[in-house]
From Swiss-Prot:
Residues 336-460 are annotated as: Domain IV, binds dsDNA. Domain I is involved in oligomerization and binding regulators, domain II is flexibile and of varying length in different bacteria, domain III forms the AAA+ region, while domain IV binds dsDNA. Plays an essential role in the initiation and regulation of chromosomal replication. ATP-DnaA binds to the origin of replication (oriC) to initiate formation of the DNA replication initiation complex once per cell cycle. Binds the DnaA box (a 9 base pair repeat at the origin) and separates the double-stranded (ds)DNA. Forms a right-handed helical filament on oriC DNA; dsDNA binds to the exterior of the filament while single-stranded (ss)DNA is stabiized in the filament's interior. Residues 1-75 are annotated as: Domain I, interacts with DnaA modulators. Oligomerizes as a right-handed, spiral filament on DNA at oriC. GO terms for biological process: DNA replication initiation; regulation of DNA replication. It comes from Cyanothece sp. (strain PCC 7425 / ATCC 29141). GO terms for cellular component: cytoplasm; plasma membrane. ATP binds at G163, G165, K166, T167. This is Chromosomal replication initiator protein DnaA. It is found in: Cytoplasm. Its main location: cytoplasm.
């Protein structure tokens, strides 16, 4: 096959972009360049030895397979290192990534308590947490850890659905420790931030500084640890960070929407370590607990609520505390603007659209995605791997999972008989993009609003 180096490399990049997650592609593949190409050999230049070793270990076969598909015959892929790359000085102070404020520009004297708490939400304290049958064990475990970190439950693994108070409890531990021991080094970080800092450290060749910062803590609070799934190097680095802290008797608290054993593509050794302490499950609150949550929220906001209003809102929102509190805010805002008295009859209209859980039809979703992306429905159901079609198809699968009760195999059938693993991969990829790409996130919000509106109109 007669093809130029530039054309071959562009085609390889295009296909790899579809196969790999965005952070993986931009960190490892996009930074590489095609150096030379003969009939049976492709030479790729990497920016540094670390990148070469990483691509060699995890992505070389994928690149070779893609090149084989394009050329129609096997090709030997060689990796070389760019010449003249300067190694940053060990005294370099600009690491190229933002650590949480606790670690940025440390001074010899201890920082004031308020600076150490700058990454913690001041509202997330134990005194503002409503305890019920659904979260009693998790609350007790967090309080025990806050009083005696690194002893009974280490690590402490909190698991539960979205909006059930995991982050509140984690940060309450941090506030409690700082209150009784102001010099404690408390580190609250999301898994996404850990990954982003790691990527930036690799690019700047600042891994030693990265490790020193992440391992010089007394209590490490890591949120949304489920997002570590499938990120091999992040898992590798977190494994060693975890071991360092645990062996030093430092407390580690993790939060996830599922237990360790149910996190896909999680290294077995990490799963084992996450499970070696206490796993505390948080369930959706019952009616009495939901009413207590609303009452406490109203008290802190100095809002007077009739009992029947509290009971109405608590009965309408059963699974998510964020939605529960959001409904209260909407109701109060509406009454404040309208000047009407706070009654069930007056707030019901503003809560009903959100309360009603409408299920969209697959056709409604296909039409919305087709119109938004300008892609015919038959192409969404087809097998084209053109980037614009693939992205639209993946978004459609994600929205169908969000807005219908269809199983993964059934969603695959709606898209021309795709395998359920393809649907799962698409949903995970779009979920990743939603967190990292503001444009995709906005498109998803607009599509969801459009789908919900169409579903309500159909119901009416």
């Amino acid at each position: 096959m007669d093809i130029s180096l530039e054309s071959l490399w562009n085609q390889i990049l295009e296909r790899l972009q579809l196969q790999l997650s965005r952070p993986t592609f931009e960190t490892w593949i996009k930074t590489a360049t095609a150096e030379a190409f003969t009939e049976d050999r492709l030479t790729i230049r990497t920016p540094n030895p670390f990148a070469r070793n990483w691509i060699q270990k995890y992505y070389l076969k994928t690149i070779a397979d893609v090149a084989h598909d394009i050329l129609g015959h096997p090709v030997d892929v060689q990796l070389v290192i760019a010449e003249g790359e300067e190694t940053p000085s060990s005294e370099e102070t600009d690491l190229g990534f933002a650590f949480p404020p606790l670690f940025r520009n440390p001074s010899p004297a201890p920082a004031p308590q308020r600076e150490r708490m700058s990454d913690l939400n001041p509202k997330y304290v134990f005194s503002r947490y409503v305890v019920g049958p659904n979260n009693r064990m998790a609350h007790a475990a967090c309080l025990a850890v806050a009083e005696s970190p690194g002893r009974e439950f280490n690590p402490l693994f909190l698991c539960g659905g979205v909006g059930l108070g995991k982050t509140h409890l984690m940060q309450a531990i941090g506030h409690y420790r700082l209150e009784i021991c102001p010099d404690s080094k408390i580190f609250y970080v999301s898994t996404e931030q850990f990954t982003n800092d790691l990527i930036a450290a690799i690019r700047k060749d600042s891994m030693q500084s990265f490790r020193e910062h992440y391992r010089a803590v007394d209590v490490m609070l890591v949120d949304d640890i489920q997002f570590i799934e499938g990120k091999e190097y992040t898992q590798e680095e977190f494994f060693h960070t975890f071991n360092t802290l645990h062996e030093a008797g430092k407390q580690v608290v993790l939060a996830s929407d599922r237990p360790p054993s149910q996190i896909p593509r999680l290294q077995e050794r990490l799963c084992s370590r996450f499970s070696m302490g206490l796993i505390a499950d948080i369930q959706p609150p019952d009616l009495e607990t939901r009413m207590a949550i609303l009452q406490k929220k109203a008290e802190y906001e100095n809002i007077r609520l009739p009992r029947e209003v509290i009971e109405y809102i608590a009965s309408s929102y059963t699974s998510n505390i964020r939605e529960l509190e959001g409904a209260l805010i909407r109701a109060v805002a509406y009454i404040s603007i309208s000047g009407l008295p706070m009654t069930v009859e007056n707030i019901a209209p503003v809560l009903t659209p959100t309360t009603a859980k409408l299920e969209a039809s697959p056709q409604t979703i296909l039409l919305a995605v087709s119109d938004t992306f300008g892609i015919p429905i038959e192409d969404l159901k087809g097998n084209s791997r053109r980037r614009e079609i693939s992205v639209a198809r993946q978004v459609g699968m994600y929205l169908m999972r969000q807005h219908t009760g269809l199983s993964l195999p059934k969603i695959g059938e709606e898209f021309g008989g795709k395998d359920h693993t393809t649907v799962l991969y698409s949903c995970e990829k779009v979920a990743d993009l939603q967190r990292t790409d503001p444009e995709i996130a906005q498109t998803l919000r607009q599509l969801s609003d459009r789908i919900n509106l169409a579903s309500r109109q159909t119901e009416n």
